[in-house]
C-alpha cells in the first residue's frame, strides 16, 4: 500500500527527530556549525572513533604478508571485511572482486593504467557530468570523446561514438551514478545497454562515489552491472579514509596486460640473470593491491559498518531522510523572492518533482544568487559570510567542469578566456564577463536535520534577500565641489602583510609610490612547506605582531603582544636595507611564494633568529620574506580591484560629484586596454580608504539588529586612509564613498582614482587588539 503524503511526512519527521536526538552525543564537533558539504566527506560519529580505539588497543595486528599470529589475524579480518563490503552493495563474491584503494580516484587510475598497457591501448568516452578524476583518463587513451545525454542515447541505439567500430581496440565508457555537482542521477542500466549494443569490446566504469554517500548501491544483477565501480568510504561513514574498486569477474581480463607489480602481488620474481615474475593468480585483488594494505583503515571499516547501521538503520532509510531534506531545501530556496518579485536563487539541481517523471536526484542543491537587480552575487563573498556564520558549504567548480559548463552556459572559448584573464581554481575571480564561473553547493547527509535546512534558508534570506519593493537604487545626491569638505583622520601602513598596522605620525610627510604608500605590505610571512603567504584568516595571532618603522636606526622593529614563554624574545629588529646578504641566495633551491593565488618571487631572509621569532610566536613554521617595490616579472604584482555590481551606476560619465572630484576615466571593457596598476602584497589595490561616518552607520545597524554587541572598530577594516568630515556641522552621508570616482588630497591636489569597493574578507571579524574572532557582529 502506498503511503499518503501525510504519512510520509510523519515518518520523515519521526526519523528526523531520531537523528536530532543523537547529534549532540555522536557529533559534538557539529556544535555551533551547520555542515552542508556531505558530498565532499561526511562527519564521523564519536562512537565509531571510540570503538576503533578500543579495537586498536585490544588487539595486535601485524603485516598481512607475514606468517605470525598477529599477521594472520590481520589477514583474516581483511578477508572477512572484504566479503562484508561486497554484501553491503549486494555484490555476489562469486561474480565480483573488491580491491581496496586509497579513494575513488585511485580506483579510476588503476583501471586506466591497466587499459593503457593493452597492445593497442584503448578508446575512451565519458559523460559530460563526470568528475575531474574521470575526465583525466582521456590523457591515457588513444582517442577520447565527451558525451551528453543525447549522445549516450544515440550510442545505446546502435551508433558507436568512434568512427571506426571494427577496430580491436577496446572502449572504456565512464559515467557517474550521481553528479557531484548538482545531484542528478544517471541510469545504472547504461552499463548493460552499452555493452550489449556495440560491436567492439566495451568496458564500463561507474563512479559511484557521490551516490553511495546517502543511497544504496545494488549490484545484485551481475550481468547488468558495470565492469568497474569505484567509491570512497569516507563519503559514507566519515572514517576511515579508504576507497574500493569493485570489479566484475567477467572483466578481470582487462588487467591481464598490467605491467607494474608491487610487494605482495607476485608468487615469484627473478631479477639476476633473467627478468621474470609470476603474478598471483587466485584472486584479482591479490594482483592489484600493491604493497602492504592499510590494515588499520580496513579494520576501522568493519566498525564503521556496524555503527552506521546502529545509528541510521539501512541505506534506504538514509536515502529517504536525505531526499526529504533535499526537497525541502530546494523548494524553500526556489520560493525565496526579493521585494520586487525577482528570484533570489537560480537553481541548477533537478527539482523534487522529477521523481514523478522516472528520474531521481541525490541530496545536493546547487545554485547561484542574484540581487534584486539581477546581478550575480560573488561566490567568494557568499563563502566568506557563510564561514563567519558557521556554515560549511562548497563553492566554485566543484571538480566537475562539464557539469559547470553546461549549467552556466560556458563555452570552451569563454573558459579559455577566463583562464587567460587570471581565473584559477580556488581564486576569488568568480564572476567573469558577467557570468559566474562556479556554483554554491549545499549537500546533505545521514546526520543532517530539518533545523540545518531552516538555518541555511534563513541565512540566505537574511543576507541576500532584498525585501524592499522598489528595484531602483537610490542615487546619491550630488555634493558641491569642496575639496576641504573632508580631512584625513588617520593614515596607516601595514609593513608585514596581515599583521598589525603602523600609524603614521600626524604631520609626517609620507611617500606615495606607484604601488601605494611607502613600506605598505612590503613584507610577508610564508609557510616553510608550501610557500603560501600566511593570513589572519587562518592565523589570527598575526594581529598581535606589531611592526614599527624606526628610520633613525634604519630598522623595522617587530614586537609580539601575546603570551610568550619566559625565554622567548618579545621583539626583534629587521634592517630596512635591501642588502643582498640578508637574504637567501637566489641560486639556492627554494620554492616560490604564493599570495592570493599568485606565484611571486619574494626574497626570504636567511637569519635563523628572524625566522624563528615569527615561527615561535605563531606556532607555524614560517619565513619572513620581502617583496620590495620596483620589481619585474614574478617580482611584481598588479591590482585586481574592480567596480562591484552595486557600483555599476558609476560607469556613465555623469557621475555624482565628490570631494575634489576630477573627470572619471572611461569604463574598461573586454576590448579596451586596461591600465595595469602595480601593487605589492595587498590583496587587490594599492590603497584602501574608509570614512568614519560609514563605520558609525554600520555600528548603528549592528546595534539595531543585535543590541548589546560591541561596536566595530575602524581598525578591523585595515584601511590605509581613514577620512572624516572636516567640519562636524557638515556631515558626510554614510557610504557616500561608494559613489565616488576618486579624491584629491593635499595642497597639490594629488589625484587618487577609485578602483572599486573592497571585497573585505572575514578578517573584519578579528579584533585587531586581542586577535579574538567575533563572527556574530558582521
UniProtKB/Swiss-Prot annotation:
Active-site residues per Swiss-Prot or TrEMBL entry: 399
Annotated region described as Disordered, given as residue ranges: 576-596, 654-673
Function in brief: Sulfurates the molybdenum cofactor. Sulfation of molybdenum is essential for xanthine dehydrogenase (XDH) and aldehyde oxidase (ADO) enzymes in which molybdenum cofactor is liganded by 1 oxygen and 1 sulfur atom in active form.
Protein name (database record): Molybdenum cofactor sulfurase
Metabolic or biological pathway: Cofactor biosynthesis; molybdopterin biosynthesis
Keywords associated with the record: Molybdenum cofactor biosynthesis, Pyridoxal phosphate, Transferase
Species: Chaetomium globosum (strain ATCC 6205 / CBS 148.51 / DSM 1962 / NBRC 6347 / NRRL 1970)
InterPro entries in the record: Aminotrans_V_dom (IPR000192), MoCF_Sase_C (IPR005302), MoCo_sulfurase (IPR028886), MOCOS_middle (IPR005303), PyrdxlP-dep_Trfase (IPR015424), PyrdxlP-dep_Trfase_major (IPR015421)
Modified residues (N6-(pyridoxal phosphate)lysine): 235
Amino acid at each position: 500500500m502506498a503511503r499518503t503524503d501525510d504519512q510520509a511526512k510523519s515518518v520523515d519527521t519521526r526519523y528526523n527527530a531520531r537523528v536530532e536526538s543523537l547529534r549532540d552525543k555522536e557529533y559534538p564537533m557539529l556544535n555551533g556549525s551547520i555542515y552542508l558539504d556531505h558530498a565532499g566527506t561526511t562527519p564521523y560519529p564519536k562512537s565509531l572513533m571510540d570503538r576503533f580505539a578500543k579495537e586498536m588497543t585490544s588487539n595486535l595486528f601485524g603485516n598481512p604478508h607475514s606468517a605470525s599470529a598477529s599477521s594472520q589475524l590481520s589477514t583474516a579480518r581483511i578477508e572477512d571485511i572484504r566479503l562484508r563490503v561486497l554484501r553491503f552493495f549486494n555484490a555476489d563474491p562469486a561474480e565480483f572482486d573488491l580491491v581496496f584503494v586509497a579513494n575513488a580516484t585511485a580506483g579510476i587510475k588503476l583501471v586506466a593504467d591497466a587499459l593503457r598497457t593493452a597492445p593497442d591501448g584503448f578508446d575512451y568516452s565519458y559523460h559530460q557530468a563526470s568528475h575531474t578524476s574521470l575526465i583525466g583518463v582521456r590523457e591515457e587513451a588513444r582517442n577520447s570523446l565527451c558525451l551528453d545525454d543525447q549522445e549516450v542515447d544515440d550510442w545505446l541505439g546502435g551508433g558507436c561514438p568512434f568512427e571506426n567500430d571494427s577496430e580491436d581496440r577496446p572502449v572504456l565508457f565512464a559515467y557517474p551514478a550521481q553528479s557531484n555537482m548538482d545531484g542528478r542521477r544517471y541510469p545504472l542500466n547504461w552499463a548493460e545497454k552499452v555493452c550489449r549494443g556495440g560491436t567492439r569490446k566495451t568496458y564500463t566504469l561507474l563512479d559511484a562515489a557521490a551516490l553511495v554517500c546517502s543511497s544504496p548501491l545494488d549490484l545484485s544483477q551481475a550481468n547488468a552491472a558495470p565492469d568497474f565501480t569505484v567509491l570512497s568510504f569516507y563519503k559514507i561513514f566519515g572514517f576511515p579514509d579508504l576507497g574500493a574498486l569493485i570489479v566484475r569477474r567477467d572483466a578481470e581480463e582487462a588487467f591481464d596486460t598490467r605491467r607494474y607489480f608491487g610487494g605482495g602481488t607476485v608468487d615469484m620474481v627473478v631479477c639476476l640473470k633473467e627478468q621474470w615474475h609470476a603474478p598471483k593468480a587466485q584472486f584479482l585483488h591479490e594482483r592489484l593491491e600493491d604493497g602492504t594494505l592499510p590494515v588499520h583503515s580496513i579494520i576501522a571499516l568493519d566498525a564503521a559498518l556496524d555503527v552506521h547501521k546502529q545509528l541510521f538503520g539501512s541505506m534506504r532509510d538514509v536515502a529517504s531522510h536525505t531526499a526529504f531534506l533535499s526537497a525541502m531545501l530546494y523548494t524553500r530556496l526556489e520560493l525565496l523572492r526579493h521585494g520586487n518579485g525577482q528570484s533570489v536563487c537560480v537553481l541548477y539541481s533537478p527539482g523534487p518533482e522529477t521523481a514523478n517523471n522516472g528520474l531521481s536526484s541525490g541530496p545536493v542543491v546547487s545554485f547561484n544568487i542574484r540581487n534584486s537587480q539581477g546581478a550575480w552575487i560573488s561566490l567568494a563573498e557568499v563563502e566568506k559570510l557563510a564561514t563567519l556564520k558557521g556554515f560549511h558549504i562548497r563553492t566554485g567548480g566543484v571538480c566537475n567542469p562539464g557539469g559547470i559548463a553546461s549549467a552556466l552556459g560556458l563555452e570552451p572559448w569563454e573558459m579559455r578566456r577566463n583562464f587567460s584573464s587570471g581565473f584559477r581554481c580556488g581564486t576569488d575571480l568568480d564572476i567573469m564577463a558577467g557570468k559566474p564561473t562556479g556554483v554554491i553547493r549545499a549537500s546533505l547527509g545521514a546526520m543532517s536535520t530539518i533545523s540545518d535546512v531552516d538555518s541555511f534558508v534563513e541565512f540566505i534570506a537574511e543576507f541576500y534577500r532584498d525585501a524592499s519593493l522598489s528595484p531602483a537604487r537610490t542615487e546619491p545626491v550630488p555634493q558641491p565641489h569642496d575639496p576641504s569638505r573632508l580631512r584625513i583622520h588617520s593614515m596607516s601602513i601595514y609593513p608585514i602583510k596581515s599583521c598589525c598596522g603602523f600609524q603614521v605620525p600626524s604631520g609626517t610627510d609620507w611617500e606615495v609610490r606607484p604601488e601605494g604608500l611607502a613600506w605598505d605590505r612590503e613584507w610577508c610571512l610564508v609557510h616553510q612547506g608550501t610557500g603560501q603567504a600566511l593570513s589572519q584568516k587562518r592565523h589570527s595571532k598575526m594581529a598581535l605582531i606589531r611592526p614599527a618603522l624606526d628610520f633613525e636606526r634604519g630598522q623595522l622593529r617587530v614586537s609580539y603582544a601575546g603570551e610568550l614563554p619566559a625565554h622567548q624574545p618579545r621583539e626583534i629588529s629587521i634592517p630596512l636595507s635591501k642588502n643582498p646578504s640578508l637574504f637567501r641566495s637566489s641560486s639556492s633551491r627554494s620554492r616560490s611564494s604564493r599570495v592570493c593565488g599568485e606565484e611571486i618571487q619574494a626574497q626570504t631572509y636567511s637569519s635563523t633568529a628572524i625566522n624563528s621569532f615569527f615561527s615561535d610566536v605563531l606556532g607555524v613554521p614560517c619565513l619572513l620574506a620581502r617583496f620590495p617595490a620596483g620589481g619585474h616579472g614574478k617580482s611584481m604584482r598588479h591590482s585586481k580591484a574592480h567596480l562591484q555590481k552595486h557600483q555599476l551606476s558609476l560607469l556613465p560619465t555623469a557621475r555624482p560629484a565628490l570631494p575634489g572630484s576630477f573627470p572619471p576615466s572611461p569604463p574598461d571593457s573586454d576590448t579596451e586596454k586596461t591600465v595595469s596598476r602595480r601593487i605589492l602584497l595587498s590583496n587587490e589595490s594599492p590603497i584602501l580608504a574608509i570614512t568614519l561616518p560609514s563605520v558609525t552607520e554600520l555600528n548603528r545597524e549592528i546595534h539595531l539588529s543585535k543590541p548589546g554587541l560591541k561596536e566595530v572598530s575602524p581598525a578591523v577594516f585595515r584601511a590605509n586612509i581613514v577620512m572624516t568630515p572636516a567640519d562636524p556641522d557638515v556631515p558626510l552621508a554614510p557610504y557616500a564613498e561608494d559613489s565616488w570616482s576618486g579624491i584629491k588630497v593635499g595642497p597639490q591636489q594629488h589625484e587618487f582614482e577609485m578602483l572599486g569597493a573592497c571585497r573585505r574578507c572575514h578578517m573584519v571579524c578579528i579584533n585587531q587588539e586581542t586577535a579574538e574572532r567575533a563572527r556574530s557582529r558582521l
